[in-house]
Swiss-Prot record:
Residues 152-164 have a biased composition (Low complexity). This is N-alpha-acetyltransferase 30. It is found in: Cytoplasm; Nucleus. It comes from the Eukaryota. The keyword Cytoplasm applies. It catalyses: N-terminal L-methionyl-L-leucyl-[protein] + acetyl-CoA = N-terminal N(alpha)-acetyl-L-methionyl-L-leucyl-[protein] + CoA + H(+); N-terminal L-methionyl-L-isoleucyl-[protein] + acetyl-CoA = N-terminal N(alpha)-acetyl-L-methionyl-L-isoleucyl-[protein] + CoA + H(+); N-terminal L-methionyl-L-phenylalanyl-[protein] + acetyl-CoA = N-terminal N(alpha)-acetyl-L-methionyl-L-phenylalanyl-[protein] + CoA + H(+); N-terminal L-methionyl-L-tryptophyl-[protein] + acetyl-CoA = N-terminal N(alpha)-acetyl-L-methionyl-L-tryptophyl-[protein] + CoA + H(+). Component of the N-terminal acetyltransferase C (NatC) complex, which is composed of NAA35, NAA38 and NAA30. One of its GO terms (biological process) is protein stabilization. It comes from Mus musculus. Belongs to the acetyltransferase family. MAK3 subfamily. The gene is Naa30. The modification Phosphoserine is found at S39, S54, S192, S198, S201. PROSITE patterns: GNAT. Residues 126-135 have a biased composition (Basic and acidic residues). Residues 1-18 have a biased composition (Pro residues).
């Protein structure tokens, strides 16, 4: 039965210290090991020579490996373990940080520039300095963990072709893309708020999508507008008027009658007159003012009163007067905001027994 030769590690004596002349051949790698210094061809030759099974062949292979290991310094066990695990020792961490920063800068530059321009720049840089290395160059074994220029260009092209992936955070985008996405979100939010506000009026009434909610102010034009005026005033005012009362004011002073229209619907009306008072000065009188309850608190009443006053001023008016119920706080506030003052209290002025206040506005 053939004897199995003992392993080289158990028979060979420990390696002798390296000669001073061999110090110049040491490996420049801080985490250098015997496997990093030997090339693949040398390892293959050693395996071929030691594969014959004779003790002499094993001793020759062991001696050759020992001689190759003398060229690299022995490192502490923890650094050897880092080298075996693919980690970079403390001595090369600054090189890795510099390489990472350089790769980020190159990726951003290639993403901003066209593909052709980036390729031409890379080619010119390689041809201009063939023998020089960049100041922060990294050894080949450390570069394997970093993405190359071609990979960065491919990632930038993928981000440009797939905006949805970049928007979801799958690909790191530039600051300009982030600003554009933020502006787009703001525009979408503002458009949604505008749509929600335009489809609902201030009183909560739903509006149809194609309906025009713009308030228009027009002057009285024809008898066809009389039913709308009567409907508004009869519904909102406590004092009933006959058709003759309306015609007295509107037919004699049509230039002092204004309507507020929303689409084809009349939502507000004012009826006034202007004549001589005691043969001394011209007095304007606001006889009726009504606004639909669904459209109140939109400034319609104020705008109608202003238009009537401007028309009276064009007719050389000296003062404007009106009467309103003493309990109608909203009407009193509207007129007082326009400069009217309380002139006189009229007791039991209306048919329902409520007192009235006479308000006056002096124009001269």
């Amino acid at each position: 039965m053939a004897e199995v030769p003992p392993g080289p590690s158990s028979l060979l004596p420990p390696p002798a210290p390296a000669a001073p002349a061999a110090a110049e051949l040491r490996c420049p790698f801080p985490a250098g090991a015997a496997l990093a210094c030997c090339s693949e061809d040398e390892e293959d030759d050693e395996e071929h020579e030691g594969g014959c099974g004779s003790p002499a062949g094993g001793e020759a292979a062991t001696s050759a490996k020992a001689r190759s290991c003398l060229r690299c310094p022995q490192l502490p066990p923890e650094q050897q373990q880092q080298q075996l695990n693919g980690l970079i020792g403390p001595e090369l961490r600054h090189l890795r940080a510099a390489a990472t920063l350089k790769s980020k800068v190159l990726s951003a530059a290639e993403a901003a520039a066209p593909d052709g321009a980036s390729k031409v720049t890379a080619t010119k840089g390689a041809e201009g300095h063939p023998g020089e290395r960049p100041p922060h160059s990294v050894p080949n074994n450390a570069r394997t963990a970093l993405p190359g220029r071609s990979e960065a260009a491919a990632a930038a092209a993928g981000a440009a072709s797939d905006p949805a992936a970049a928007r979801n955070g799958l690909v790191e985008g530039t600051e300009q893309q982030e600003e554009e996405e933020m502006d787009e979100q703001v525009r979408l939010l503002s458009s949604s708020l505008t749509t929600g506000c335009s489809l609902r009026s201030s009183q909560g009434r739903e509006a149809e999508p194609g309906e025009d909610r713009t308030i228009r102010y027009v002057r009285y034009e024809s008898e066809l507008q009389m039913p709308d005026i009567m409907r508004l005033i009869t519904k909102d005012l406590s004092e009933p008027y006959s058709i003759y009362t309306y015609r007295y004011f509107i037919h004699n002073w049509p230039q002092l009658c204004f309507l507020a229209m929303v689409g084809e619907e009349c939502v507000g009306a004012i009826v006034c007159k202007l004549d001589m008072h005691k043969k001394m000065f011209r007095r304007g009188y606001i006889a009726m003012l009504a606004v639909d309850s669904k459209y109140r608190r939109n400034g319609i009443g104020t705008n109608l009163v202003k238009k009537a006053i401007y028309a009276m001023v064009e007719g050389d008016c000296d003062e404007v007067v009106l009467e309103t119920e003493i309990t109608n706080k909203s009407a009193l506030k509207l007129y007082e905001n326009l400069g009217f003052v309380r002139d006189k209290r009229l007791f039991r002025y209306y048919l329902n027994g409520v007192d009235a206040l006479r308000l006056k506005l002096w124009l001269r």
